[in-house]
């Protein structure tokens, strides 16, 4: 096998591994986001900010 062919095989293999790793990381991120939905810092700050700016109307 020539140098060019071996280089192409290595690039293809790296591309395959990169694609698989991208899918794994995105699935893990999605699962983490779904599991930790209420404890996300941005979600909490937006919730608190809304409560401070617009207090609930009582009676």
Swiss-Prot record:
The keyword Membrane applies. Its main location: membrane. GO terms for cellular component: plasma membrane. Keywords: Cell membrane, Membrane, Toxin-antitoxin system, Transmembrane, Transmembrane helix. It comes from Bacillus subtilis (strain 168). Encoded in a 48-kb, phage-like element known as skin. It is found in: Cell membrane. This is Toxin TxpA. Toxic component of a type I toxin-antitoxin (TA) system. Overexpression of txpA causes cell lysis; the TxpA protein has been suggested to act on the cell membrane or might possibly block cell wall synthesis. Overexpression in E.coli is not toxic. The chain crosses the membrane at residues 7-27. It is a single-pass membrane protein. The keyword NAD does not apply. Induction: The antisense RNA ratA acts as an antitoxin by annealing to the mRNA of txpA and causing its degradation, protecting the cell from TxpA by blocking the production of the toxin. A type I toxin-antitoxin (TA) system, where expression of the proteinaceous toxin is controlled by an antisense sRNA.
């Amino acid at each position: 096998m020539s140098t060019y062919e071996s280089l192409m095989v290595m690039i293809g293999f790296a591309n395959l591994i990169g694609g698989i790793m991208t899918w794994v990381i995105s699935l893990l991120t999605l699962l983490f986001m779904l599991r930790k939905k209420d404890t996300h810092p941005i979600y909490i700050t937006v919730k608190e900010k809304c409560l401070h700016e617009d207090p609930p109307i009582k009676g």
